[in-house]
Amino acid sequence: MASEEASLRALESLMTEFFHDCTTNERKREIEELLNNFAQQVGAWRFCLYFLSSTRNDYVMMYSLTVFENLINKMWLGVPSQDKMEIRSCLPKLLLAHHKTLPYFIRNKLCKVIVDIGRQDWPMFYHDFFTNILQLIQSPVTTPLGLIMLKTTSEELACPREDLSVARKEELRKLLLDQVQTVLGLLTGILETVWDKHSVTAATPPPSPTSGESGDLLSNLLQSPSSAKLLHQPIPILDVESEYVCSLALECLAHLFSWIPLSASITPSLLTTIFHFARFGCDTRARKMASVNGSSQNCVLGQERGRLGVLAMSCINELMSKNCVPMEFEEYLLRMFQQTFYLLQKITKDNNAHTVKSRLEELDESYIEKFTDFLRLFVSVHLRRIESYSQFPVVEFLTLLFKYTFHQPTHEGYFSCLDIWTLFLDYLTSKIKSRLGDKEAVLNRYEDALVLLLTEVLNRIQFRYNQAQLEELDDETLDDDQQTEWQRYLRQSLEVVAKVMELLPTHAFSTLFPVLQDNLEVYLGLQQFVVTSGSGHRLNITAENDCRRLHCSLRDLSSLLQAVGRLAEYFIGDVFAARFNDALTVVERLVKVTLYGSQIKLYNIETAVPSVLKPDLIDVHAQSLAALQAYSHWLAQYCGEAHRQNTQQFVTLISTTMDAITPLISTKVQDKLLLSACHLLVSLATTVRPVFLISIPAVQKVFNSIIDASAQRLTDKAQVLVCRALSNTLLLPWPNLPESEQQWPLRSINHASLISALSRDYHSLKPSATAPQRKVPLGDTKVIIHQTLSVLEDIVENISGESTKSRQICYQSLQESVQVSLALFPAFIHQSDVTDEMLSFFLTLFRGLRVQMGVPFTEQIIQTFLNMFTREQLAESILHEGSTGCRVVEKFLKILQVVVQEPGQVFKPFLPSIIALCMEQVYPIIAERPSPDVKAELFELLFRTLHHNWRYFFKSTVLASVQRGIAEEQMENEPQFSAIMQAFGQSFLQPDIHLFKQNLFYLETLNTKQKLYHKKIFRTTMLFQFVNVLLQVLVHKSHDLLQEEIGIAIYNMASVDFDGFFAAFLPEFLTSCDGVDANQKNVLGRNFKMDRDLPSFTQNVHRLVNDLRYYRLCNDSLPPGTVKL
């Protein structure tokens, strides 16, 4: 014993040293090694058993339990049966003896270790494992311990990790399912007993039927008077011990509900009991009493009571989240909803002492979250099922949800509730779309609720009604979606407004427009307060209160303009004529507002509070332009109608809009406003396309300022947008006009002069015989290249999907710039930032204008690139120039992707050199690099080469297929095909999961479209190599997220030759597996059934993989020299 005693003292001092602040990392590593070596010794567990019973040192106990855990989970197979019996007997005794005094985390760990033994040995060698747990639960002294054991068993045995064979996993699940009814009965009994015991002693008399608690909805919601009566019982006050037992029982239930199927085992009495406990969460009295009585003990009690409510709601939500509900369980669900809505009514009850919001503020935040989760699950999963029950009052439910939503104490809570309304509105919309006949009935039923929702959501986004809350929202920090908290708040609110508009267009419009009108009056009335001062114009509103009111009104106007813009889509298409007048009213107001803002130059005005009011004025102006832009599709439809009726009204709208835009296209205007004006101009030119646009003086003014060499250039983004608008005005066909009236010759001349002016400086960079290259500093040259190519690339990109005529004119204007680019390219091959921009430009040209460029010139470009990208140049770009260099190579490969996809024979002569470039120059550089750069693009190019040029490799003739019945194609260029396949195979051995997924998809696509796996060369030389690699990937768990895709791919490959797979490949694969013995290999082979359907086959694959890993784990854990029988 002395040695055990000495070891314990040594271990305690080592542990104390290890966790001491002054211990160096070096020394910690030494101690760690020492402890690991100790744990590996045969029989180390005996020392640990002594340590556990003899020490009070937490670190030592934790270490000892870790040794046991390792022994049971990794080495159990090799432990002599006598030792196992001793461990199975000693650890539970230790737990029983010390569970009251052990720290909770040690006790829980010891429970887990005992459950781990059960996972391995129950019921065969540890037959009383589960009965022991049931006995612990039934004995009042050990109930908490039994519940902890039960929860741990549910966690570890119902969904065990992969260190068990599939057969054992299935056996454990079945064993547990057999116990479910007993366990649920026990848990129900515990909860009911505690409740009943404390209900009897509750001091508060039950409320009379007429008192405030009996809500007016109860008669509807609760059909059975007995459950109503039960729910009216006062909530008992529990002692600490009972509180603890109930929380453990509810935790057990929540975990059990996560995996057991919905069935009759879940009895009505269990559900009612859970709801009793859910009431603890909405009991504000307990909190009040705790705070009145003041003692910390009482405060803890208040929190614990709240926690019981949270746990009970977790149980309810576990049941709610199950989409598949057996018929016999539907009635239970209905009862659950009724009981939950009783709770919802209770927490949204408004009486003198409490406003709803203050009541919600008093509740535990987690309880509110759980309750909101319940409501979300109810609407998203069960509403369609429940709505048809006549006894379920959906409209009353919406009334409660409305109160609950608009009294949420936090912004996050409000967002979550808006999500629920969005789900409800989506449900209504899809219901109406699927059953058009019921539209009126559905809308009549919900109309009042929707109008109320719309009004309240609109009030919530206005500072006029909600300033205190809105001021709290952050409008500076961007989240992951690149929006601020305020923008997110506004966007989510406007989505709800838009969904109501879709269902009730007239109501929505008549609710929103007057509110917009009120705020517009304030804005349009500002003109009377503008006075001229020495330095310009000033807004003569200075009183602090007036400034604050103006600030609120401007913020609201900005939000309402966004709302009006969001609704634009509900005025077009089939309803254009019916809602024409409403839309015209909106558009006329918007045009008036934008013109007003531009004329009195509110964006440049001096104000009393410049840091607040100036951004407000700029924002309103920008939002009015953006809202008008949202109506561009409506204007386009109006343009079509106006063309037939030749209406002056439409011409005036467009001309006035241009008068509003033109003053803003200037370097003196703030970026936000400038870009809004540019975007509106682009929409007019691209979407509306009025014939007279180019002849409007305001547009000609913009055109002249852009081609004027002396004019100051706009910022990059604005310049690109304005040039796009002008180019589209000249290039896009006018709607509703025949080809003969399109005025192409005149438009072509104008377009050429526009492009010529834009690329003037760029052309001057090209060296010629008469004028050798001007010495422009490199920095300036780069600026010229960037400015010109960004504009030209954008112009091409925007024309690429248009008519042939538009593309022809575009290419005629650009021809010289393209030739200049090709001439300059070699000079900048070592400047990766310039090459990157040039290749972007060429890529856009190839995608949009390759037909117009013509074959000879396209060939010249491709040849130039192939000559420039030598192996040395590629290596320099990829290896030494970082991300820009890689981007250059990726763009070059993208250009080649466009080339290999071109139908017809034109570019076929390039295939050999493109494949050679890929396989001999790019692939060797990137194959072994861990970085994913360039790989995705290279493999996409290889895939497109195969997919679009299949006959380059497989020559199939009609005659051959007629003669043989099945064409066994002639194979050509076999070495190249094999090299490409080899590269795909290699890519599956690399860690990058995105590349793996992409390449697996490419192979599967080639099989679907071209029968790749059936081709003789693939079938005979590659098929089972690929299957082998994919199986190994599954075994190594390196790409676990793709398990399903890999399983399907293995099936598709194996199905080409099932006989070969079962008879030759599988035995061979098992023979080559290391870490398993012959007997285990036989079992693995026998368990792989010869099923040939996809679900069974993939199930067999995953079973094989799981069991192979399990056997290896077992064998690794056996002590050396173990004899296996």
Curated annotation (Swiss-Prot):
One of its GO terms (cellular component) is plasma membrane. The modification Phosphothreonine is found at residues 201, 204. Signal peptide: none annotated. The modification N-acetylalanine is found at residue 2. GO terms for molecular function: nuclear export signal receptor activity; small GTPase binding. GO terms for biological process: protein export from nucleus. Pfam families: IBN_N, Xpo1. It is found in: Nucleus; Cytoplasm. Residues 31-97 form the Importin N-terminal domain. InterPro entries: ARM-like, ARM-type_fold, Exportin-1/Importin-b-like, Importin-beta_N, XPO6. Its main location: nucleus. The modification Phosphoserine is found at residues 199, 208, 224. Disulfide bonds: none annotated. Keywords: Acetylation, Cytoplasm, Nucleus, Phosphoprotein, Protein transport, Transport. The keyword Nucleus applies. Mediates the nuclear export of actin and profilin-actin complexes in somatic cells. Belongs to the exportin family. Found in a complex with XPO6, Ran, ACTB and PFN1. Interacts with ACTB. Interacts with ACTB in a RanGTP-dependent manner. This is Exportin-6. It comes from Mus musculus.
